[in-house]
A protein has these predicted regions:
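RNase H-like, metal-dependent nuclease domains and their acidic two-metal-ion catalytic environment used
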Residues: 1-79, 115-201
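Short alpha-helix plus adjacent loop in nuclease-associated cores
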Residues: 72-118
Length: 201
């Protein structure tokens, strides 16, 4: 099989996910994979590197030398186990479809959360776009780049939730009595109007 690497960034200001790079490695071996990891870290200086640990890739999450090298550049290595959850329509790969925006009356609405770069000079990006177009649940075709994007999007969604104003108003069952006593009620109509004014006013 192939090994795929997708590099993204999440912009907290516009709440968009920007895909920076995609590498679709044919005939991967440990040396090529390690070199690609190092190249991506040096080029993009990420905060986190996610690795699927289902097959032989598990060795990377256990590789203390790699962990040490990554930490010397301030990069955390996170392991991701893929089970049947990848087919879950609310959480899995299919849930990314809404992030690419919607079409109404045959017209794109411009409401996408994911921005893809040009495919002109990148075979990896061409592969990602092609796999996104042809992806369907339980597919037997190549899905390496789509899966790599999904791992990255899972992390971006965590940032999106932290960035959401909803987190401020959500119930917290672990709140202390002091924190609970400082809770206040708000008028959602007024809060929405205020947020609308801040964002679009």
């Amino acid at each position: 099989g192939n090994a795929a690497f997708v590099t993204i960034t999440f912009n907290r200001i516009d709440s968009k996910i920007y895909v920076l790079d995609c590498i679709n490695m044919t005939e991967p071996n440990p040396q090529k994979i390690r070199q690609t990891i190092e190249d991506l870290v040096l080029k993009y200086k990420p905060q986190e590197f996610r690795v699927e640990i289902n097959a032989h890739q598990k060795a990377y999450s256990l590789d203390e030398d790699l962990r040490s090298w990554l930490s010397s550049y301030g990069v955390r290595l996170e392991a991701h186990f893929t089970g049947k959850n990848k087919w879950d329509t609310n959480f899995g790969v299919a849930s990314m479809s809404t992030l690419f925006g919607t079409v109404r009356d045959g017209k794109f609405q411009g409401n996408n959360t994911i921005e893809l770069p040009s495919t002109a000079d990148s075979e990896g990006m061409k592969a990602l776009v092609q796999q996104l177009i042809t992806w369907k649940p339980n597919t037997r075709g190549k899905t390496d780049t789509v899966m790599a994007l999904w791992f990255a999007v899972l992390r971006a969604r965590e940032f999106m939730q932290q960035n959401s104003n909803m987190a401020r108003y959500a119930n917290n069952r672990w709140a202390t009595r002091a924190q609970s006593s400082r809770k206040v009620s708000i008028n959602l109509d007024e809060a929405f109007a205020e947020q609308w004014q801040e964002n679009y006013g």
